[in-house]
From Swiss-Prot:
The gene is sucC. PANTHER family: SUCCINATE--COA LIGASE [GDP-FORMING] SUBUNIT BETA, MITOCHONDRIAL, SUCCINYL-COA SYNTHETASE BETA CHAIN. One of its GO terms (biological process) is tricarboxylic acid cycle. This is Succinate--CoA ligase [ADP-forming] subunit beta. Keywords: ATP-binding, Ligase, Magnesium, Metal-binding, Nucleotide-binding, Tricarboxylic acid cycle. Mg(2+) binds at N199, D213. Substrate binds at N264, G321, I322, V323. It comes from Aeromonas salmonicida (strain A449). Its EC number is 6.2.1.5.
Length: 388
């Protein structure tokens, strides 16, 4: 689960990290009033969406009057912001962050992720702040310095000092960096983060460290024990199809292709997408109906897949282990009738009661193409999609 920048900074402040005074505003009037609360003559206004690249897309502005703030809010609130990290539709802007302006002398990078290989939280720091860290990691990896935190021990001050020296910090900056590092490390463990990023962490004109931005992703599997963070979830940022799927305990991820996929089991779903690609097709989604597939869930799965206007054909690939293939066949027949599927549907059934399931599909009188193998299914669905 992602947090907005203003939510991340609120958490930073709770752990004693230096952040700008700011207010998340839902109306142009609130945004203008926030400038009065903050004071000063210059403010930064930022669209709050779960995506990077806001500045280049016009979603961040330096404002020198309340009229500019109000105009920025009027322009963006209720609209979608499209960045290089969003799809063509963009993300809806429901909040504008208005905060005080910071004089920047230098930009640094500080981030942390869970390294599953070492079973540690790995902090990364770089003198190249304010830019895409993936680009730095690819082109100049020597500029990224790391520190691994053992979750049983927690962050250590000596690790912070080592990173501070490598970043070229001096004097009181080392103490400030140590405080930030220790706070972030403890926050990461306390709040079950999967990713944390401050880009940039700046050195101000006065020589102090300041968290100018904040990005947080929380491990969704740990949300049951993070009720406070769970309340921060912003459903407006979710893909509507993914949100619909979650209500039915379906694992759905939208993609860019034109072949809808419905599979039971995540591994089989990934293998299905691979073989569709291998035969020249392009999957429109990842959808795992799981081991408890029922007629109702299959029906909802069809609805979700077909809500994507790009879908030209649907491939259903079911391995009957826990689930009986004849029951799945009944679900497919019922779903096709209820939803009124207009695109070709290719079905491959294998395993428990597969032959009985295939007979039910054949006797249904519906335009369902039965496949004899996974390769045959992929070839048939690619051919059907091209014919559309």
């Amino acid at each position: 689960m992602n947090l907005h920048e203003y939510q991340a900074k609120k958490l930073f402040a709770e752990y004693g990290l230096p952040v700008s005074e700011g207010y998340a505003c839902a109306t142009p009037q609130e945004a203008a009033e926030a400038a009065d609360k903050i004071g000063g003559t210059t403010w930064v206004v930022k669209c709050q969406v779960h995506a990077g690249g806001r500045g280049k897309a016009g979603g961040v502005k330096l404002a020198k009057s309340k009229d500019e703030i109000r105009a920025f809010a009027q322009n963006w609130l209720g609209k979608n912001l499209v960045t290089y990290q969003t799809d063509a539709n963009g993300q809806p802007v429901t909040k504008i962050l208005v905060e005080s302006c910071t004089d920047i002398a230098k930009e640094l990078y500080l981030g942390a992720v869970v390294d599953r290989g070492s079973r540690r939280v790995v902090f990364m720091a770089s003198t190249e702040g304010g830019v895409d860290i993936e680009k730095i990691a690819h082109e100049t990896p020597e500029l990224i310095h790391k520190a691994a935190i053992d979750p049983l021990v927690g962050p250590q001050a000596y690790q912070a000092r080592e990173l501070a020296f490598k970043l070229g910090l001096v004097g009181d900056q080392i103490k400030q960096f140590t405080k930030i590092f220790m706070g972030l490390g403890q926050m990461f463990l306390d709040c079950d983060f999967a990713l944390l990023e401050i880009n940039p962490l700046v050195i101000t004109a006065q020589g102090n460290l300041h968290c100018l931005d904040g990005k947080i992703n929380i491990d969704a599997n740990a949300l049951y024990r993070q009720p406070k963070l769970r309340e921060m979830h912003d459903p407006s940022q979710d893909d509507p199809r993914e949100a619909h799927a979650a209500q039915w305990e379906l694992n759905y991820v939208a993609l860019d292709g034109n072949i809808g996929c419905m599979v039971n089991g995540a591994g089989l779903a990934m293998g299905t997408m691979d073989i569709v690609n291998l035969h020249g097709g392009s999957p429109a989604n990842f959808l795992d109906v799981g081991g408890g597939a029922t007629k109702e869930r299959v029906t909802e799965a069809f609805k979700i897949i077909l809500s994507d206007s790009k879908v030209q054909a649907v491939l259903v690939n079911i391995f009957g282990g826990i689930v009986r293939c004849d029951m799945i066949a009944e679900g497919i027949i019922g779903a096709v009738k209820e939803v009124g599927v207009k695109v070709p549907v290719v079905v491959r059934l294998e395993g428990n009661n597969a032959e009985l399931g295939a007979r039910k599909l054949a006797d249904s009188g519906l335009n369902i193409i039965a496949a004899t193998s996974l390769t045959d299914a992929a070839q048939q669905v690619v051919k059907a999609a091209e014919a559309k």
